[in-house]
């Protein structure tokens, strides 16, 4: 299954490691360092120029990518639940 992260960006749900609230988690020095390193290494994709609300960490073929999205983590998690629910039909 796939998860729409905003604009025209979709990722396979099987590649998602975590969905995080950017406002709450960026208070941590470790998280800020992680995001800065990911940006420095070219592993960050900004989904939209709008104010970011979440970041999504994905691993595909042993490559980590961090997506910055304007969609709230709660909405993204609901979408993954909806997709998982469809699989049970």
Regions found by a protein language model. Give the residues of each.
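Eukaryotic intrinsically disordered, low-complexity regulatory linkers and tails enriched in Ser/Thr/Pro
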Residues: 1-89
């Amino acid at each position: 299954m796939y998860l729409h992260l905003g604009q025209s960006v979709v990722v396979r749900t099987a590649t998602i490691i975590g969905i995080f609230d950017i406002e709450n988690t960026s208070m941590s020095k470790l998280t800020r360092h992680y995001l800065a390193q990911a940006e420095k290494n070219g592993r960050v994709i900004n989904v939209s120029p709008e104010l970011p609300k979440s970041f999504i960490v994905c691993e595909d073929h042993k490559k980590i990518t961090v997506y910055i999205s304007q969609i709230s983590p709660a909405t993204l998690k609901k979408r993954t639940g909806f997709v998982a629910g469809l699989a049970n039909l």
